[in-house]
Amino acid sequence: NQSALNDLMSLERVEVIKGPQSTLFGKNSSAGVISITTKLPENEFGGKIQITGGDYGLQKIGGTVTGPISENTSFRITASTHERDGYTKNLNTGNEINDRDRYSVRAQLLSEVSDRLTLRLIVDSDSADENCCTTSALTNGAATLGFASVIGPMLGKPVIKNPVDPFGYETYLDKEPRTKIDTSGISFHVDYEMENVKFKSITAYRESEQEVFDGDVD
């Protein structure tokens, strides 16, 4: 889901598992799995914050905080924001595209009811609203040159540069790519250990709304 595109601030580990994994991870894992495990809530207060800045107005802020609520219950809250101006100019509209505008928040509650029973509640929300993504050509092929020789005079302006500047960050689109994705979910985990058997139950619900438009060059 959209979480894969956001900055994960509280990672415990990342596992790359090759080959079919349907027995453990379901039918959509026939080619392998990238398993991302986040940190559990902890019984001691702690946290971190990370701030990054860069070209094109890049601003990335993320943080996580964890701590106890009671003797057996603890929490963890993780959030991040990622913003950046567009750096590729659409010669048709004059707009700057390939921007970033992403947000995410995740909250966990962990309750160790007994030595054998553990309950865990997770709620998360992710959002992306971007004019993204497109690329720039490294060279002009015959089809591109033919298209430009016809369309350019009709519009009264050049639609390509020849030769291409590979670092020019320019494109020509009559429909700009756009991505708007909002996802949210909740899951409840029950772990119960018996003498020779470990029982695990996961009940979850996830909702996603997407508006994705591909760029059109004609």
Enumerate the predicted regions with their spans.
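Flexible loop residues that form catalytic
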Residues: 19, 78, 82, 112, ...
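Short, glycine/serine-rich, charged loops/turns that create anion-binding
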Residues: 21, 41, 206-209
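Outer-membrane beta-barrel translocator/receptor signature
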Residues: 8-12, 23-90, 95-105, 116-117, ...
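A generic secondary-structure micro-motif detector
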Residues: 1, 52, 96, 176-177
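Outer-membrane beta-barrel domain signature, strongest for Gram-negative TonB-dependent receptors
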Residues: 94, 100-218
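Short acidic/polar hinge/loop motifs at secondary-structure boundaries
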Residues: 1-18
